[in-house]
Amino acid sequence: NILKLKSFGYKIIGPEIGDMACGEYGEGKMTEPNEIVNTLKNYFSNLDKNKKLKALVTAGPTNEYIDPVRFITNKSSGKQGYEIAKCLRDNGFDTTLISGKTSIKPLDGVNFVSVETAEEMFKESLNNLPTDVAIFSAAVSDFKVKNYKSTKIKKNEEFNLELEKNIDILNHISNHNSLRPKI
């Protein structure tokens, strides 16, 4: 599939060969964020500056609530997505950043949407289509709580946590031709 995409002229960034997050060595290591940003800067600096293109970026973690005060999440600072959004903005894109909760302040000149859950991120992503460029860099929770409790679970209360799969935002959007961004 990668060879097919390359034959259509798509630029593929990564994966690299090296030590991966799972502790194994091989192809699958994430490309360094600075290299991703530099590749994007080079690509976008060669585009026609007279045409205003739209860009959508997701960043940060999503939280899936167990009860009103507890949640499961994927750890993410959001820095990579914010830097990508900044790069797109600086290259003249009308940029929307959909972000989970981070300590980073919203960027000037970027349309900012704050979300908490994967479902919210999915809905906001759909609301911001069509777009010319979409970069899904958020650490979206793969699972959500099946048996959410609307009141705080007491510490002496028995509770079994059941999970179910969350929607795969990237997969959903990239597999629907009417939604799929050009980049």
Residue ranges and their predicted role:
Residues 116-183:
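Glycine-rich phosphate-binding loop
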Residues 27-34, 74-78, 82, 115-119, ...:
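Electropositive phosphate-/nucleotide-binding environments in soluble metabolic enzymes
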Residues 18, 60-64, 138-146:
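Short glycine-rich anion-binding loops that position phosphate/pyrophosphate groups of nucleotides
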Residues 26, 70-75, 154-159:
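Short glycine-enriched, charge-decorated loop/helix-capping segments at active-site entrances
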Residues 3-7, 49-117:
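Glycine-rich phosphate/diphosphate-binding loop of Rossmann-like nucleotide-binding domains
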Residues 1-44:
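Internal gly/pro-rich beta-alpha loop/helix module
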